[in-house]
């Protein structure tokens, strides 16, 4: 029981959350937008605003890209070699390293790096939610959103915005769509279709060797994704979102393509992921729609396979991987940033070519802009404490639990 409690706390940071929950926060209180006297196209935004309601913001774009967004299960920068920002002698993610170097990687250091772990973002459905909505998922919810009728009905998400702009949207996962309310999160916020293990079994020939205990192995998922994308791309502008699974705790899932050259099982699975993802990106590059498609790769959370991160030095900051391919905007402010998964929301839209009034959506800040993120402005400890407190605004207007 004691070990179970320790694991639960390490996964959801629930002890600190409970201690703060009796207090209330004012960070979601309506802030008056202040605009400097500059041309509209030059306005960067107000860095003092913590929360910006996306429903009150003008988001526009006439020549925006398609989107491929891939949540990478448990992919963190720790498994890079020391030369590139990890702790390993041999790089477990060589292909992903090169992709990050050749494209845009936002980093917390002057090497490759990524988003900092943050309350309400550090397990899969919470990570998806934070990147999708710019808000943390309430810790006490954990994976129980399948018990709710609606998934944050008051939130305006990436899916809602792309739906308003005529995008056809599909989520493809190798597990069951109902787990943790994944189906509700996406289908209730602009998505047209979810392809999961059950629907894929009906549509394609799936062999037993293609399966693990969660559902479809990633090599098969990427194989079938090519078919889904080919069909989707013929319908107009699209958002194709995926989530991998092979690096899931407690020890990951080996497949027939995994090498046996690294120190342990998990590192071999990591190396396999790097090759699979890179191969999929290479396929994308050969398609007619590639030049008009932004691809975003993001680790969903640091791994929970604790036995494989016991060697992490106490002074090393674990972060999740990110890479923006074919972004329509650039920035020279990519290194030594302090940001969370909530910042992926406006940053992704900006990468696609959308103009975001004030560069802030929910608790997220567009990393391509000149604005500091909320944790750069106010400090991670302060913002972390505030989001753990109760908020009548969020409960009434965003979460609206049963």
What are the functions of these language-model segments?
Residues 19, 23-56:
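Short coil-to-helix leader/linker segments, especially the first N-terminal amphipathic alpha-helix
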Residues 46-402:
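Solvent-exposed soluble domains appended to multi-pass membrane proteins
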Residues 1-25:
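Transmembrane and membrane-interface helices of multi-pass
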């Amino acid at each position: 029981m004691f070990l179970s409690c320790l694991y639960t706390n390490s996964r959801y940071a629930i002890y600190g959350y409970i201690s703060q929950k009796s207090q209330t926060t004012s960070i979601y209180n309506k802030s008056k937008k202040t605009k400097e006297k500059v041309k509209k196209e030059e306005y960067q935004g107000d860095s003092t605003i913590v929360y910006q309601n996306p429903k009150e913001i003008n988001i526009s774009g006439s020549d925006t890209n398609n989107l491929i967004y891939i949540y990478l299960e448990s992919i963190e920068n720790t498994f890079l070699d020391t030369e590139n920002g990890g702790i390993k002698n041999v790089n477990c993610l060589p292909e992903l390293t090169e992709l990050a170097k050749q494209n845009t990687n936002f980093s917390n250091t002057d090497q490759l790096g990524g988003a900092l772990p943050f309350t309400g973002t550090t397990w899969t459905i919470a990570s998806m939610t934070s990147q999708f909505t710019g808000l943390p998922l309430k810790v006490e919810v954990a994976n129980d959103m399948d018990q709710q009728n609606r998934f944050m009905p008051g939130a305006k998400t990436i899916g809602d915005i792309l739906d308003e702009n005529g995008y056809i949207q599909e989520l493809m996962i190798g597990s069951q769509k109902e787990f943790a309310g994944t189906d509700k999160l996406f289908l209730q916020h602009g998505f047209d279709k979810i392809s999961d293990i059950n629907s894929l079994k009906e549509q394609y020939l799936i062999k037993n060797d293609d399966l693990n205990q969660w559902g479809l192995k990633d090599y098969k998922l990427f194989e079938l994704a090519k078919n889904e994308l080919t069909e989707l791309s013929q319908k107009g502008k699209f958002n194709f979102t995926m989530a991998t699974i092979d690096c899931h705790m407690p020890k990951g899932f080996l497949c027939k393509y995994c090498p046996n050259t690294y120190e342990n099982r998990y590192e071999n699975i990591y190396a396999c992921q790097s090759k699979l993802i890179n191969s999929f990106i290479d396929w994308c590059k050969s398609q007619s729609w590639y030049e008009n498609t932004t691809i975003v790769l993001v680790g969903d959370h640091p791994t929970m396979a604790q036995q494989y991160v016991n060697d992490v030095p106490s002074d090393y900051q674990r972060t999740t991987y990110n890479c923006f391919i074919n972004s329509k905007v650039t920035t020279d402010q990519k290194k030594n940033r302090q940001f969370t998964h909530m910042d992926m929301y406006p940053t992704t839209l900006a990468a696609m070519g959308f103009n975001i009034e004030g560069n802030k959506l929910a608790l997220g800040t567009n990393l391509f802009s000149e604005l500091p993120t909320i944790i750069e402005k106010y400090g991670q400890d302060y913002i972390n404490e505030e989001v753990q407190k109760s908020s009548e605004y969020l409960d009434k207007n965003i979460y609206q639990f049963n």
